Amino acid sequence: MSSLISFIFLFLFSSITASAQNTFYLYHNCSVTTTFSSNSTYSTNLKTLLSSLSSLNASSYSTGFQTATAGQAPDRVTGLFLCRVDVSSEVCRSCVTFAVNETLTRCPKDKEGVFYYEQCLLRYSNRNIVATLNTDGGMFMQSARNPLSVKQDQFRDLVLTPMNLAAVEAARSFKKWAVRKIDLNASQSLYGMVRCTPDLREQDCLDCLKIGINQVTYDKIGGRILLPSCASRYDNYAFYNESNVGTPQDSSPRPGKGGNSSVIIIAVVVPITVLFLLLVAVFSVRAKNKRTLNEKEPVAEDGNDITTAGSLQFDFKAIEAATNCFLPINKLGQGGFGEVYKGTLSSGLQVAVKRLSKTSGQGEKEFENEVVVVAKLQHRNLVKLLGYCLEGEEKILVYEFVPNKSLDHFLFDSTMKMKLDWTRRYKIIGGIARGILYLHQDSRLTIIHRDLKAGNILLDDDMNPKIADFGMARIFGMDQTEAMTRRVVGTYGYMSPEYAMYGQFSMKSDVYSFGVLVLEIISGMKNSSLYQMDESVGNLVTYTWRLWSNGSPSELVDPSFGDNYQTSEITRCIHIALLCVQEDAEDRPTMSSIVQMLTTSLIALAEPRPPGFFFRSKQEQAGPSIDSSTHCSVDEASITRVTPR
């Protein structure tokens, strides 16, 4: 949001309810760059527009949303109002009328204005604002109350997932509205609400809500963000009228009154009885197998809550037994968020146990994310999640055991790399490409990995690659193509420019990482190693681009191959990698195109453009160079506040 005003504001919530007749002003924003004179045609059209919005018939207010226009270009005015779904038509009309009467006082000479009230929103502009996403000039408001009985880092995790789920629900609904009740513990609950103007496309609504939800810090009880096209809010009381919106998800049904009470009692009692019987059956089975781990490969249900993967849960004592109490000799390695141990279950099945560090950057949100994401994935080039353990401060993931460690263990060791000839490496490149394609396109979800690197590619007995470490993965909604984040996580050197610098990521971000990975596989060199040896060379991407430009790409080839490779095949892979690391994300190919390029030599390849993070020599420099490389096997996480476009 290029003009987002972000500050802390103490809420005056004590006397506000969803059914209040008194309109409560929140905020407004005027466009000071476009103004009109009091006697102009635009002024006349604006007054006509506002009058029409405040004098509609009763049925028009019952819908809660109306648009209107007045005049002809260049003095045409477009306007709309949006009332909350849970308010009555009379409250809606009262709010719109009140807002109309205040517009010329708050924005007397401005051609554009947006006015936020507790019960409604009013907008007008000299541009077409109907069915057009606008996230400029918003307001972030937050209470000063700390979460009660909940740690702040846990509080964000508890709130963020339900709010994101509500955003997806709202985007897909006709009214573009959704609410959630979030249970913190037995005595505390939060209530969430998200909404968009109903004229928005599903994807525009979801993008708007994601921007707003991600701007909220979630470190206080109570917060909201107001944007022209959408809004979101959470607080520890029901600030909306529950009876007018239905029972929010995760809350218990409330009995009704009058003639419908019998129907409601039946509707409540019968499901509860069935649920009780199911629970009895489940607990009976679990009691019988209390000391036995579930060692079968589970199938997770659809949904983004960790509870849907309940059958994946392991007992901590059983994991301790499998790893000999995490004996150091069983330690396989250490990743960005904790240590990985080899374990053997009581059935004899070997597993890899990822024990997250208590001080690691991966909190419960990332932990839950990795469980939910990986549990849904079934592909030969993705590591299988067998289960998890969440007890006290322990957060543990149990994966299939992949015996040959990670790709970087072979690539960057002068002795071990001899085990990877070009034929094996070419198969590894193809396997990684197919795994990413599955994540992006062929699975039930659209998943952006965000941390593809050699250390996260595991190799099985036959040296087949398996993509691992989904803690930073993001699930995209239907038709979503890109997203923004304030928290840039991953490994510099593998990050695309738009992600590292602006927090913008998409499938093309993974494509960039794949390109870097291919260059490392071909050369046997780390992307960052060249900079450590010679700052003028920069990184592997820069070095490759210079070789390509000079017509000598074969100099990149790992000398350990000898003459055992096809020049045309390896040159084509370098060409594909350079297409993947182009600076502009739109220029990079999709993973489906990449797989076709790798398998069919008849497909003509476009000429690559200069890559992102290109280190220019003194002769090449047209400006300062950018150094974003770091050691490729260490996660360097950072926090970045971005300004979404």
Swiss-Prot record:
ATP binds at residues 332-340, 354. GO terms for biological process: defense response to bacterium; response to salicylic acid. Keywords: ATP-binding, Glycoprotein, Kinase, Membrane, Nucleotide-binding, Phosphoprotein, Receptor, Repeat, Serine/threonine-protein kinase, Signal, Transferase, Transmembrane, Transmembrane helix. Induction: By salicylic acid (SA) or by a bacterial pathogen infection. Residues 21-262 are extracellular. It is a single-pass membrane protein. Residues 616-645 are annotated as: Disordered. SUPFAM superfamilies: Protein kinase-like (PK-like) (SSF56112). It is found in: Membrane. PANTHER family: CYSTEINE-RICH RECEPTOR-LIKE PROTEIN KINASE 13-RELATED, RECEPTOR-LIKE SERINE/THREONINE-PROTEIN KINASE SD1-8. This is Cysteine-rich receptor-like protein kinase 19. The gene is CRK19.
